[in-house]
Amino acid sequence: MEGWQEPPRIPLTQICRVSHTAPVATEIGQLTDTLPLTFDLAEDLVWAGDTNGIVSSYYGETLQPYSRFRAGRGRVTSLVSHDRGLVALTTDALHYSTRGGLTRKHVTDPSLGNNLCMTFTHGPTEFVVGGNPGKLVVVNSERGDVTRVVDSPGMATHMAGSSSCVVWGTENGKLVVGDNNLKELHTFQAHQGPFSDVSVQDNVVMTCGFSAASTGHRIDPLIKVWDLRMMRAMAPISYPLAAFVCQTPDSRTLITSPSGQLEFLDHATQQIKLYQAEVALVNGVKLSPRGHHFVVSDTSGQLQLWSDEPQSSFAEFSAPTAFPTPEQSYPPVSIRDTRYPLGAVGMPYYSDTLLSAMPSSIINVGMPPEEVDEDLEVRQIDFVGHAPNYKQQKRNLAQKYSNQRRTSIAAPKFLSEKEKERARRMEDIEDESFFGDEDTCTEASMSSKKVPRLYRKLEIKYSKFGISDFDFSYYNNHTGLSGLETNPFNPLLQLFRFCSPVFNFALRSVARGTPNRLLNEVGLLFDMMHKARGHVCRASNLMHCYDGIAQTRSLAPEDATNIVLFCRFLLEQIGFEQRQTPALFDSFRQLLGATVITVNTFSCGKMAQAESVWYTLELALGSTFYECLERTLDKELHTRAWCDKCRKYQSLHVSKHVESLPQVLTLSVADGNVDVAKSFLVLDGKVSPAAETDNDAYKLVGFICQIQGNGQVAFIRVGDEWYLFNDFLVTKVSEKEAFMKTPWKRTVMMVYAVGADERFDYDSWKNDMDVSALFEERLVNGNNVSRETTDYGYELIKEVPPPKTLCAIDAEFVVLKNEETEIRSDGTKVVLAPRNLCLARVTLLNEDGHPFINDYIAINEHIVDYLTAFSGIEPGDLDPSISRKPLVSLPTSYRRLWLLLNLGCVFVGHGLANDFRTINMQVPPEQVIDTVDLYYIPSERRKLSLRFLAWCVLGKKVQSGNHDSTEDSHTALLLYKKYQDCAPEEFQVLLLDVYRQGRMCNFKVPEA
């Protein structure tokens, strides 16, 4: 307490003359007005307000003027420091601004009138405002709106808060203690008249105020003290003229009289120190957060700063204050003065993309020339320099541009993190990208043994929101082509997807509804990748079908991920299933199968001939690609085998000759064929095999490469450009890079096609779709139910729905596998794999609200969790042997949805993005109406549940027990119709009211 001193004061009259509303008593009992003062919690600033709504700030112990701005039309009544600025309360508004004066939010509301005081409630964004008789108003400064109004006895004139409670004093001398939700905990009668000041520190409240007198009011000679933990009064502090009271963090109390007498009371040592400030009449006192500075203002317009620790900061951890950069004056320069470069002229402020910011795909910027080696032995003869050429590097060689400073790039943020960052900055942030200048591969980088990161194995990271929170666009270089989630067979699927003959054949087969399930799944995947328009897709349905084939379960672990074996098995299995329909089998064989004639000749003269179909040809050994291909088409070998004619082992000559080649030729490269794997180059993409091909030339569609120490990638020609596909990473590459020899890249498969330039058929097959699945029950075998004994809950449609028909949809799911997590050494929980959900029920309603599809899906796998509370599915409902529900297979239900999608129907539902992702179906945005997005205000950063919207908008309670997809889809349909019935302005008012009601009940439906 020793050493309190007053540095030089400043006159407030230079800036404003102040007069305010909260009363303070003089020695003779008169009332004057107080000045709102406060210290900044984060920087060395002092804030003051005036009667004209002006707020001013002063920097440091010299009280240097820092900023000045208008907070409102009325007088300033309260100031609260914020970590991102200042919150000022005027009589008619609440103003939230930066320290420099830029407005963040300006809140006006009919409930905000005659405002006198405010303080924090929940965190630094929610404030409670007092001054209106009988009520307190809660305002959110970040959202800029009134969240709720709370009834309160009397009119609050003073407020203070702590971490656990809010304290306010009324005009009749009552002190009210409430929790952070403003629920009244206790009320004390502190004074007979109004309050003069209220101070809260930890669990101690001190107040000073007025008593009634014959001439009006006189100052109360006692400072009242209360313990908030025990909710009882403590011994008061006697001080005859206490107008202001402030508590420091180190158990000291500053008491100030109107005449400027300052008393410091140390509660630990009971020492009292008195000081006298040279003032006219004190109308404001405020202590700094550390307790080593305080400011005093008086009615003459003076502001004094006192300190017992000079040259120290006001706050505990003070941040540097930003000052404007001093303007520099430059001498005028003529535009014709060639001594000054044009780059010396600064750029004005701009918000649009500059023309000079061209992407590297448009123009390839070269590197500046290398500097001349200083070691050259230069000799000058007649002013001409000469040096020997040691031929260490090529002359006049242009180098591709490479940014040496960028060595790596951060992993992508989760989508939820990006939304939080956008909200925190209150502006759009630039989307990150995996691709940079260093990803332009040069001959030097490609010849290095280090694998470039474009070719490395990628990994999906999972947040608490699952895989939907992963930013896949980070890995797609604005190509408009869809990648696939991690799967070892993705390169082959991508290769066939961009082979137009295969694509068209698969889509036509799906449209006709062929019984070949593998081929159907391939076609559905291709259609989904086309509709995705660059968004990532999943091959989970195809792989689930593939894994269900008995032969795949006996594969060795190393063969289970072999892409060549997968290709051979996939095509052979499709061909085997196609044999049930000879016409379809012939078409498939002509498309992908090579007819091979095998002739076995024994030394005894016995001869046998057989015809077979090969869907992949393995290149034989050879020095060139053409030599390898010729040996592949005609193979001969000698061995010994058992002869049934001679009944003994004989020498056998085997001749294999490719009699006819398919339209699409699939070639594989054996592991030992290193020369072909590393050095085959067919730059023009055409090759004419030595077989009966009617002189048609094959064109290279693409090829698959094994990356050393990583997985496989695909190089595919799309139009006239080459693209690299590495799971969900898709980027354009040059033809030179695609065919470049590298020590870490080995070709394993390639696809050639006759008519590779054939147009992709995206729409014409829709005219020949088999839509019978929409009109037939198609229950699974063993499901002993019928319409005579069971209420199916729906009626099948009788005719094909026209385009743009509204279909309300809701889907329910069950868990087949729980998520896999890992607890790290630091205690953090990391999701290794999300839970595996499977479609269990899907319901669709027509525009009138009548169900026409209500499919329960038969599941033969083990179900870990039925999620009954959310799905309404009970154990046994999906078992065909015991279920009393109408069960259909997953392919049947999926086909019904796919048919409605391609018929142009529009789906209405709530949370459809998650439903369609789990179903694994890509639906164009123009065919989706999601009530989650319709009833959403982005600035609120909260999406509303179906149950709450039904209660608040429709006035009905849903999901009271277990969820029911029929009820949920019908509720979503009603919400959409409500949206259609409202005019745009009317709907905005409705939506604001929905959020207002939600904040009052915490967005939960009241139970009563």
Curated annotation (Swiss-Prot):
Note on how the cofactor is bound: Binds 2 metal cations per subunit in the catalytic exonuclease domain.
Subunit field text: Forms a heterotrimer with an asymmetric homodimer of the regulatory subunit PAN3 to form the poly(A)-nuclease (PAN) deadenylation complex.
EC numbers for this chain: 3.1.13.4
Single GO term (MF): nucleic acid binding
Encoding gene, per UniProt annotation: PAN2
Function: Catalytic subunit of the poly(A)-nuclease (PAN) deadenylation complex, one of two cytoplasmic mRNA deadenylases involved in mRNA turnover. PAN specifically shortens poly(A) tails of RNA and the activity is stimulated by poly(A)-binding protein PAB1. PAN deadenylation is followed by rapid degradation of the shortened mRNA tails by the CCR4-NOT complex. Deadenylated mRNAs are then degraded by two alternative mechanisms, namely exosome-mediated 3'-5' exonucleolytic degradation, or deadenylation-dependent mRNA decaping and subsequent 5'-3' exonucleolytic degradation by XRN1.
Regulation of catalytic or functional activity: Positively regulated by the regulatory subunit PAN3.
Cofactors (names): a divalent metal cation
Gene3D superfamilies membership: Cysteine proteinases, Ribonuclease H-like superfamily/Ribonuclease H, YVTN repeat-like/Quinoprotein amine dehydrogenase
Enzyme class: hydrolase
Ranges for region Linker: 314-449
Localization terms from the record: Cytoplasm
Coiled-coil residue spans: none
Record-annotated Exonuclease domain positions: 808-976
UniProt source species: Yarrowia lipolytica (strain CLIB 122 / E 150) (Yeast)
Swiss-Prot/TrEMBL WD repeat ranges: 29-68, 110-149, 158-198, 200-236, 277-316
Annotated protein name in UniProt: PAN2-PAN3 deadenylation complex catalytic subunit PAN2
